[in-house]
């Protein structure tokens, strides 16, 4: 019952499926047997997914003279388990957990924890990989030399020097919008590379600020950006009744000014796109 409750909590809090965790437990028990008996090729584990009750058993060949107790069983012992057992038969022998000993049990726990860490890393990677080329709001954690560490919620991203706008300065706890440039899978977790200079940042900001851009009525056909200085975007309307430049500028410049503020004063020129 305690194990089942623990798996339910892990499934909810860590977003790791119970089936994956049960698989990790199965592998950990097999590994515990291997460490304890020296081999585990003949070991099988069954786990009830509803109750989390498990049993571990080894398949052993019935022999007249036992040379390898991990793989073989005497006829006398085999017939205690199955009265019809004969020499050469394969008998299933249940292994009780107390036989593993303290070290083997600890090994099982370590394997489970390792699997949980691996699954957490995979879940994080999948989550942020799906956010590549998107803009997110992060919180500046610390400045590491010329790089900036930005907390994105469940993971930190790196804003390297060459992806920073010249003369921009950041302070810890400051909230900033960043463009997720690339997400790399590493043994320590996802490495998330961020940018404040990429033209995609400007495009995504317009998509979030201008409804007509978000729904596709107005298209941003091209962007030329000198980060920190000036950006020029060419826009096109798929609806003759919608002025693409006016939609992006907004009433009294409200929409474009909001983006300029986010880009810390970078000038933005909006023109009609001409093939």
Predicted regions and their residues:
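RNA-contacting regions in translation and RNA-metabolism proteins
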Residues: 1-275
């Amino acid at each position: 019952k305690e194990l089942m409750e623990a798996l339910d909590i892990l499934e909810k809090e860590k977003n790791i499926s119970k089936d994956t965790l049960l698989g990790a437990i199965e592998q950990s028990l097999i590994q515990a047997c291997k460490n304890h008996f020296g081999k585990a090729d003949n070991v099988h584990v069954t786990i009830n997914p509803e109750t989390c009750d498990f049993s571990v058993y080894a398949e052993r060949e019935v022999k007249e003279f036992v040379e390898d107790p991990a793989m073989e069983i005497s006829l006398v012992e085999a017939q205690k388990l199955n009265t019809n057992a004969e020499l050469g038969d394969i008998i299933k022998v249940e292994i009780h957990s107390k036989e593993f000993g303290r070290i083997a049990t600890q090994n099982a726990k370590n394997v489970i924890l390792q699997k949980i860490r691996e699954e957490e890393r995979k879940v994080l990677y999948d989550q942020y990989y799906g956010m590549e080329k998107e803009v997110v709001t992060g919180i500046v954690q610390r400045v590491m030399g010329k790089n900036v560490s930005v907390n994105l919620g469940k993971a930190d991203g790196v804003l390297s020097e060459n992806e920073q706008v010249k003369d921009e300065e950041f302070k810890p706890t400051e909230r900033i919008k960043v463009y997720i440039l690339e997400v790399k899978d590493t043994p320590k977790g996802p490495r998330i590379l961020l940018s404040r200079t990429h033209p995609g940042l400007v495009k995504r900001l317009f998509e979030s600020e201008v409804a007509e851009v978000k729904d596709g009525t107005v298209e941003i056909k091209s962007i030329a950006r000198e980060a920190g200085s000036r950006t020029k975007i060419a826009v096109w309307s798929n609806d003759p009744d919608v002025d693409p430049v006016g939609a992006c500028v907004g009433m009294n410049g409200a929409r474009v000014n909001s983006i300029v503020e986010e880009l810390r004063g970078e000038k933005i020129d909006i023109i009609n796109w001409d093939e």
